[in-house]
C-alpha cells in the first residue's frame, strides 16, 4: 500500500539502506492523503512532492497493482525478504436500517474519492453525470467524525443547496475535532444533534 503507513515505513527502511518497492492498487501514490482528505485540508502538491522525494531516494513505486490478481502474496514473498501489509481501511461501515440500499445513498469514501479525483483532473463518470456532485442538492451526512466533516465541507464547496449533519450524540461528545465542527458551522452546515436515522425513504 502506498498510503501514509506504507510510505512512512518505506522511508524509514530506505534510510537504513534497504531496497524498497511499494505496490499499490491505485494509479497514484498517497492513498488516503490523495483520495480521501480534501484539497482544502491537504493540498495534493504536498503529497506529490513527498512522493517524488521518496522516488529520488531510490524507493520504487508499482501502481495499478493488485495483490491476488497481478501476483499472489506468496509470489511477492519469493522476490522480497519481507513484506509489510499497509493496505488501509476503505470498507465503509454500513447502516443496517430499512432503505439503506436506496438510490443516492453513498459511502463517504466514494464521495470524497470522486471529488478528489475530479480536483486532480481525472474524468470521474459518477461525478460528471451528477451522481456524486453535490451541486444544487440537499445533502445529509450521517456521522460525527473527521470524515463526516470532510463530507459536509466538501458538499458546501460543491455548492450544495443545503448541508445537514446528523449525529447521535451532542456536540460535546462528537469524535471529530472541535475545530472541524466550528469550521463546518461557519461555512453554513446545519447540525442536528441527538439524531439517529431509523430508515431511509
Task: For each feature predicted by the language model, list its residue ranges.
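Residues that mark the start of a beta-strand
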Residues: 19, 137-138
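N-terminal Rossmann-like FAD-binding beta1-loop-alpha1 element of flavoenzymes
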Residues: 1-21, 147-156
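Hydrophobic or amphipathic alpha-helical targeting/insertion segments
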Residues: 13, 20-23, 79-86
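A Rossmann-like FAD-binding core segment of flavoenzymes
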Residues: 45-94, 100, 110, 116-129, ...
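Cofactor-binding loop segments of dinucleotide-utilizing enzymes, especially the Rossmann-like FAD-
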Residues: 2, 25, 144, 167-170, ...
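Conserved Rossmann-like nucleotide-cofactor binding loop
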Residues: 5, 28, 90, 147, ...
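Glycine-rich FAD pyrophosphate-binding loop
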Residues: 16-34, 163-172
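Active-site-proximal loop->helix
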Residues: 30-37, 177-183
Amino acid at each position: 500500500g502506498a498510503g501514509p503507513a506504507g510510505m512512512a515505513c518505506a522511508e524509514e527502511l530506505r534510510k537504513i539502506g534497504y531496497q524498497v518497492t511499494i505496490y499499490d492498487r491505485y494509479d497514484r501514490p498517497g492513498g488516503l492523503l490523495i483520495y480521501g482528505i480534501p484539497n482544502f485540508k491537504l493540498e495534493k502538491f504536498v503529497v506529490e512532492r513527498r512522493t517524488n522525494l521518496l522516488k529520488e531516494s531510490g524507493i520504487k513505486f508499482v501502481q495499478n497493482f493488485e495483490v491476488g490478481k497481478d501476483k499472489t502474496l506468496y509470489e511477492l514473498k519469493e522476490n522480497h525478504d519481507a513484506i509489510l501489509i499497509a493496505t488501509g481501511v476503505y470498507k465503509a461501515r454500513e447502516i443496517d436500517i430499512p432503505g439503506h440500499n436506496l438510490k443516492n445513498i453513498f459511502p463517504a469514501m466514494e464521495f470524497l474519492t470522486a471529488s478528489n479525483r475530479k480536483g486532480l483532473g481525472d474524468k470521474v463518470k459518477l461525478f460528471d453525470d451528477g451522481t456524486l456532485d453535490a451541486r444544487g442538492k440537499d445533502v445529509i451526512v450521517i456521522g460525527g467524525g473527521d470524515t463526516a466533516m470532510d463530507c459536509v465541507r466538501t458538499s458546501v464547496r460543491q455548492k450544495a443547496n443545503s448541508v445537514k449533519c446528523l449525529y447521535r450524540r451532542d456536540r460535546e461528545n462528537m469524535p471529530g475535532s472541535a475545530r472541524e465542527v466550528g469550521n463546518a458551522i461557519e461555512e453554513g452546515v446545519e447540525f442536528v444533534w441527538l439524531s439517529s436515522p431509523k430508515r431511509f425513504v
